[in-house]
Amino acid sequence: MSDNKVLQSTAIIRFPDCDPFNHLNNSRYIDYFINAREDHLMEAYQFSPYAYAKEKGLSWVIGQNQIAYLRPAMLMEKVVITSTILKLKERDILVEMMMWDKDKTQLKSLLWSVFVHYNFKTGKSEFHSEDLVTYFKPFENPLEKDVSFEERLLQLKNSL
């Protein structure tokens, strides 16, 4: 995957998000990933999903998540979160997100999220406009080979 299409930010694991063992609670990983992705959209793409929703009555909703937990993220640990668009399709976008330790030597979690383009007025999915496709297509970062989530996870484990 091309590095210039992989966006990243940092986060600190906070106390209210942890379980009694001081590990990030499994349900909170997705919150950290989605918050980072929103930041990535606004900072790197200069695209606010909130302004888009307000102006167009359209946005994206999560249609599917696949997540693997590899190592615990610990209380007050600084982590690096990356995101990249794997596939831009007619009605949805597949985004890969990873959570790493601060040095990016230990992968803590892998998430694939399918974001479905959604029309608030009709309550149904909506095709991406030509303008959106033109805007986001340059950021698409497909894997060299079309693989399943499990195969991707195995690739990453074997490369570390």
PLM features: residue spans?
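Terminal targeting signals and extreme-terminal segments of soluble enzymes
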Residues: 1-78, 90-94, 98-160
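Functionalized membrane-embedded alpha-helices
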Residues: 79-83
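Short, charged beta-turn/beta-strand-edge "cap" motif at the junction between a beta-strand
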Residues: 85-88
